Amino acid sequence: MSEDEEKVKLRRLEPAIQKFTKIVIPTDLERLRKHQINIEKYQRCRIWDKLHEEHINAGRTVQQLRSNIREMEKLCLKVHKDDLVLLKRMIDPVKEAAATATAEFLQLHLESVEELKKQVNDEELLQPSLTRSTTVDGVLHTGEAEAASQSLTQIYALPEIPQDQNAAESWETLEADLIELSHLVTDMSLLVSSQQEKIDSIADHVNSAAVNVEEGTKNLQKAAKYKLAALPVAGALIGGVVGGPIGLLAGFKVAGIAAALGGGVLGFTGGKLIQRRKQKMMEKLTSSCPDLPSQSDKKRS
């Protein structure tokens, strides 16, 4: 059974696929969003034990989400090539939602790290810039600016997890799971596109092959016509050049080739006719030579 014969129409798999796109995966994404909110709350409040537990629970949700996406992917692989455009339209919204949720979750920790790095750099550059501001405007003071900067950092940046806390290790595990989930979502988005590109490529090759076969057939037909037309002429030319009875035999020989190329009953009948004419001509030739017995003499003897 070929690969195409194993495919089925989308309408047969649509209920199962929509169960994933409308219910199962959105439920997992909503659960993941709640974990993200709790993680941000516990990390901001430095409740490391609760943060560690939330990391573990979020990791379980991510694993469940990955499992459900793989199951949906198996269904997508069974869809017939004619329905790939509709399939892509069906799974794109949930694919984009999963990609966005994963990116936001990873960005939460990334922004915290980047903000801490920025804070260190700002502290190195803060004193000269504040001195210039005080000189020009006479309003902004160094102490007030430092307090404002620290206040903004505390509001927007999450505190770094101490490395001696279990939450630090559990976050690394969760981060790896989220990255794997991101790759899985990307692969799912490329699945339908790659299948469609493969089908388009095969169609292009088939069309090119059909064109080549058509052109080749036309060329063969032309060549056959030219050859069949040329052979009788060649026979006539050979017969005319050689002359006499031998030249006539040479012409018949070339004509016999043409009859063989014609094929079928016509070729067979023409060949028999040429054979009879050749036999009669041989008898005439042998009868004109006194030293050679004729075919009829041989039969009598």
UniProtKB/Swiss-Prot annotation:
Coiled-coil stretches noted in the UniProt entry, renumbered to this chain: 49-128
Cited SUPFAM superfamilies: t-snare proteins
Modified residue annotations for N6-acetyllysine: 41
PROSITE patterns referenced in this protein's UniProt entry, alphabetically: SYNTAXIN, T_SNARE
Cellular component terms per the entry's GO annotation: autolysosome membrane; autophagosome; autophagosome membrane; COPII-coated ER to Golgi transport vesicle; cytosol; endoplasmic reticulum membrane; endoplasmic reticulum-Golgi intermediate compartment; endoplasmic reticulum-Golgi intermediate compartment membrane
Subunit structure as annotated in this protein's UniProt entry: Forms a SNARE complex composed of VAMP8, SNAP29 and STX17 involved in fusion of autophagosome with lysosome. May interact with VTI1B. Probably interacts with BET1, SCFD1 and SEC22B. Interacts with PTPN2 and ABL1; involved in STX17 phosphorylation. Interacts with COPB1. Interacts with TMED9 and TMED10; the interaction is direct. Interacts with VAMP7. Interacts with RUBCNL/PACER; promoting targeting of RUBCNL/PACER to autophagosome. Interacts with VAMP8, SNAP29, VPS39 and VPS41; these interactions are increased in the absence of TMEM39A.
Name listed for the protein in its UniProt record: Syntaxin-17
Organism: Mus musculus (Mouse)
Gene name tied to this protein: Stx17
